[in-house]
Each structure stands twice: as structure tokens, then as C-alpha cells.
């Protein structure tokens, strides 16, 4: 794989021209644009310039639509990795109650679509959800991807819950996730560490 680096001062036109060149290059099978972009570059315009079949992140509107419609599409790597890990722990997800804490286009929404595809009952929550603890206590699966250090506490998680922590937060203690690992590990069937 090749990495193409530009200074923050790069013109949007230069980035779009490079994407078009890569789209046409049959030796290139995937394109990933590292976000966030400099403020003067229109993120949506850049994402939409990528050929959907080469969109590694799955951010192109066609891929987002295909995923939410249940069609074949590129899936962002973090939700896909979380999904595969959950399936390894619990192969039959049908009928399971899942709570996704976070509604981002990068993690929360794609994760929701993947779990729905497995016939889970999914509740999408976020930092402003009223009584988030009560929502989590109902869950067989919790995916925390909200960007709040150690938000999910031990008394939010019932026994034998699968807990996937996507959060990466810098704190005085160092890097921590969105889940209080020490507390939640007492109840969880499986729990991902951060960092890990």
C-alpha cells in the first residue's frame, strides 16, 4: 500500500484530482482518506469523490445506503471488527438486545446496521439519552463509542453481557475507553480493554 501525504495547506482541488487519478487506476483496489481534513477542505465532497467500490471506510453515501438497506457494501473497519468479535463470542445474535452508545457515522450507525442484520433488537443511545444506565442494564450486548471517558459503569451492566469498548480518551490516568474496565469486568461475559 502507498501513503500519499499532503501538507495541511493543500488545496482541495489537488486532493480531488488525486482521488480521481486513483479511481481510474486499476492497480488501486482501495482508497482511504484520513480524517479529519483541514478546515478549508469539504469533507463530504472528498468522500463523494471516491469510487464507492474503492471506498475502504464505507463513508460514500452509496455504501452507507447499501449498508442500511442490507445490501453488499464497504463497512467501516472499526464496526466490522467489533461485529466479528461479537460473533466470535456469540455466534447466534438473533433476538439479543443490543445497546449502541454513540450515534456517529463512523461507528455507532454502521454498528447498529450490522447488529440489525443479525436480528438483534438495537437501541441507539448517546450522551444525552435519559437514563442511559437503565438502557444498558437491559442489554445483552453493549458497544460503547461515544467519546466520554469511563462513562459505562459496573452497575450499568448485567451479568454475562458482551461489552465492546471503542472509546479512546486521553485522561490524567492515560488512555482509557468509554467503559470503566475494572468495574465492568466483574459482570461482563466479555470485555475489550482500552488500549488493547
Name what the model sees in each region.
Residues 1-32:
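N-terminal ligand-binding/catalytic initiation module
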Residues 8, 76-162, 174-182:
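Glycine-rich phosphate/diphosphate-binding loop of Rossmann-like nucleotide-binding domains
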Residues 29, 140, 189:
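Conserved acidic residues
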Residues 30-33, 144, 164-165:
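Redox-cofactor binding/interface segments in oxidoreductases and associated redox assembly factors
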Residues 32-93, 111:
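Anion-binding alpha/beta catalytic cores of soluble intermediary-metabolism enzymes, centered on
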Residues 32-36, 101, 194:
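Short beta-strand segments
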Residues 36, 145-148, 167-168, 196:
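Short glycine-/small-residue-rich Rossmann-like dinucleotide-binding loops
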Residues 43-60, 64, 159, 164-196:
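Rossmann-fold NAD(P)-binding glycine/threonine-rich loop
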Amino acid at each position: 500500500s502507498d501513503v500519499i501525504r499532503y501538507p495541511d495547506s493543500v488545496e482541495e482541488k489537488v486532493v480531488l484530482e488525486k482521488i480521481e487519478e486513483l479511481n481510474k487506476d486499476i492497480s488501486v483496489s482501495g482508497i482511504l482518506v484520513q480524517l479529519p481534513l483541514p478546515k478549508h477542505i469539504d469533507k463530504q465532497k472528498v468522500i463523494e469523490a471516491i469510487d464507492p467500490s474503492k471506498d475502504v471506510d464505507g463513508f460514500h453515501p452509496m455504501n452507507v445506503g447499501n449498508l442500511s438497506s442490507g445490501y453488499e457494501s464497504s463497512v467501516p473497519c472499526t464496526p466490522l471488527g467489533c461485529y466479528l468479535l461479537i460473533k466470535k463470542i456469540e455466534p447466534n445474535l438473533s433476538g439479543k438486545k443490543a445497546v449502541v452508545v454513540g450515534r456517529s457515522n463512523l461507528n455507532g450507525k454502521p454498528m447498529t446496521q450490522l447488529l440489525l442484520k443479525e436480528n438483534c433488537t438495537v437501541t441507539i443511545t448517546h450522551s444525552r439519552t435519559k437514563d442511559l444506565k437503565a438502557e444498558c442494564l437491559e442489554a445483552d450486548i453493549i458497544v460503547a463509542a461515544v467519546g466520554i471517558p469511563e462513562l459505562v459503569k459496573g452497575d450499568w451492566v448485567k451479568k454475562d453481557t458482551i461489552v465492546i469498548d471503542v472509546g479512546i480518551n486521553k485522561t490524567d490516568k492515560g488512555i482509557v475507553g468509554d467503559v470503566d474496565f475494572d468495574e465492568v469486568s466483574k459482570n461482563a461475559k466479555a470485555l475489550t480493554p482500552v488500549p488493547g
